Swiss-Prot record:
Organism: Anaplasma marginale (strain Florida)
One Pfam entry name: SurE
General function of this protein: Nucleotidase that shows phosphatase activity on nucleoside 5'-monophosphates.
Binding positions for a divalent metal cation per the UniProt entry: D8, D9, S40, N94
Name by which UniProt lists this protein: 5'-nucleotidase SurE
Family label: Belongs to the SurE nucleotidase family.
Entry annotated with the keyword Cytoplasm: yes
Keyword set includes Nucleotide-binding: yes
GO molecular function per UniProt: 5'-nucleotidase activity; metal ion binding; nucleotide binding
Taxonomic lineage of the native organism: Bacteria, Pseudomonadati, Pseudomonadota, Alphaproteobacteria, Rickettsiales
Length: 261
């Protein structure tokens, strides 16, 4: 089986290094195509009509000066040019959970979606952290992913119910793992929570006049009232697997308007 690894945290991120270690020896070919820098929250942006500089680190490794979706598509194109597209794309391992309202913003899930859009089975993997971003390089932040991810990927590949019919998003807890649960993503209250301080505002005076610079803090999903949602189950210590499809339709509202026609 030929597999492509990608992410949104960047080619040289710790999560990519962990993912490489996890899949080592389990696939016939492993390719890597990932952004040159951290592209967290880049969502599904593609660099349309813009040349995308790509450095080759090896015959099967590409550092892409573009978005996560760019990286996935370029990796698939490179693999296809050798005679066969990948059998699987794995995006991650993201540093931080992707649950609830963070899902549409996630570059990790977007890279998987770019693969899924062109017919390649895709899995996105995210590792919850304990609230301190500086723990990125601490091995304990990744131990649950190291222990659990490959077994779960193998399970999905054997599962005829999935067979690449949707994106599979896996969130791994920071705390002791209580088991594996399948769940939808939480979207209870209609609003995103920005943990404070939500942004840092700086005024800058330069040669071209007065400017304002903003730096957004991490975005997290609000606490869900649904105990069976991805956010709640992750907080309870479960590895959460969420099937994600194409549709963004609000069917409840659509049904009401269709009833008036």
């Amino acid at each position: 089986m030929r597999v492509l690894l990608t992410n949104d945290d960047g080619f040289d991120s710790v999560g990519m290094r962990v993912l490489r270690d996890v899949v080592s020896g389990h696939f016939a070919e492993v390719w890597v195509s990932a952004p040159a820098r951290d592209c967290s929250a880049a969502s599904r942006a593609l660099s349309v009509r813009t040349p995308i500089k790509t450095h080759m680190r090896g015959e099967r490794e590409f550092v892409v000066h573009g978005t996560p979706a760019d990286s996935a598509v370029i990796g698939i194109c490179e693999m296809t040019s050798t005679g066969k597209r990948p059998d699987l794309v794995i995006s991650g391992i993201n540093y931080g959970a992707n649950t609830g309202f963070t899902v549409p913003y996630s570059g990790t899930i977007a890279a998987a979606a770019a693969a899924f859009d062109i017919g390649v089975p895709a899995i996105a993997i995210s590792q919850q952290y304990n609230g301190k971003r500086c723990d990125n390089n601490v091995e304990t932040s990744w131990q649950n992913s190291r222990k659990s991810v490959m077994a779960l990927v193998s399970r999905l590949l054997r599962d005829t119910m999935w067979h690449g019919k949707c994106i599979m998003s896996i969130n791994v807890p920071y705390s002791d793992v209580q088991g594996v649960k399948f769940a939808g993503h939480s979207c209870d209250d209609g609003h995103i929570k920005w943990d404070g301080p939500s942004m840092e505002r700086r005024e800058i005076t330069s040669g071209d006049g007065r400017c304002v610079s903003y730096v957004f803090d991490d975005m997290r999903s609000p606490n869900s009232n649904d105990n069976a949602s991805d956010t709640q189950l992750l907080e309870q210590g479960y590895i959460v697997v969420t099937p994600i499809g194409h549709s963004m339709t609000d069917h409840a509202t659509l049904d009401k308007y269709c009833g008036l026609q």
